[in-house]
Amino acid sequence: MKRNFDSVKRLVIKIGTSSLVLPSGKINLEKIDQLAFVISSLHNKGIEVVLVSSGAMGFGLNVLDLEKRPAEVGKQQAVSSVGQVAMMSLYSQVFSHYQTKVSQLLLTRDVVEYSESLANAINAFESLFELGVVPIVNENDAVSVDEMDHATKFGDNDRLSAIVAKVVGADLLIMLSDIDGLFDKNPNVYEDATLRSYVPEITEEILASAGGAGSKFGTGGMMSKIKSAQMVFENQSQMVLMNGENPRDILRVLEGAKIGTLFKQED
């Protein structure tokens, strides 16, 4: 299927912790600089971009010199709180090199599930677009809870990115991962696994080919990405799942290059 993204005027890009934090726990400065360059280039072309960025926990572990995620929820929230500040500080610094202004929006599920707060969030996004600012979104990990009587967590930022794409009316969601796209089976296990270039619908076969958890720094696995694609389909939009190793590939994707997996319903 030929890809044409010429009509894309509003774009959501999601980047995961594994793309921002090296296996050693150090911050991937080169990757963040490339991402800022790409988003700034798109911004200069008149495309409105929202960046949904994981990484608060990974940055927090780095700042506090901790080797692994704490088991206690309170400490997890504290580490994420420290990491969010460090992450946004770096983003602000790097984007400023390209004369691009950024802002921080921290969301919880209850914000988008209640009409009044959702309207406020939409107004905030629209105002930022009008001001020429790139919103950087993350879940508010320091206060989010996952309890039956008051669940405020999205689950992971794959889902959050699909929700943000719906909230802002994005023409396209690009999800950067540590894998090249959706394969017919797990490429880490099967050498003959084949990359699916195009997925027009989420079938039982597609669901069966997704499995496994995320990295030690993040939470998202392939199943969460498939569920995000389902949400994108429900909103009559489209999504590209691609490897985040080289953020400049985003520019090639928007030019029509067949990189990663395109989730788009047939016309």
Swiss-Prot record:
One of its GO terms (molecular function) is ATP binding. Pathway: Amino-acid biosynthesis; L-proline biosynthesis; L-glutamate 5-semialdehyde from L-glutamate: step 1/2. It catalyses: L-glutamate + ATP = L-glutamyl 5-phosphate + ADP. It comes from the Bacteria. Keywords: Amino-acid biosynthesis, ATP-binding, Cytoplasm, Kinase, Nucleotide-binding, Proline biosynthesis, Transferase. It is found in: Cytoplasm. Transmembrane segments: none annotated. GO terms for biological process: L-proline biosynthetic process. Substrate binds at S54, D141, N157. GO terms for cellular component: cytosol. InterPro entries: AceGlu_kinase-like_sf (IPR036393), Asp/Glu/Uridylate_kinase (IPR001048), G5K_ProB (IPR041739), Glu/AcGlu_kinase (IPR001057), Glu_5kinase (IPR011529), Glu_5kinase/COase_Synthase (IPR005715), Glutamate_5-kinase_CS (IPR019797). Its EC number is 2.7.2.11. Pfam families: AA_kinase (PF00696). ATP binds at K14, S177, D178, T219, G220, G221, M222, M223, S224, K225. NCBIfam families: proB (TIGR01027). Catalyzes the transfer of a phosphate group to glutamate to form L-glutamate 5-phosphate. Belongs to the glutamate 5-kinase family. This is Glutamate 5-kinase. It comes from Streptococcus thermophilus. The gene is proB.
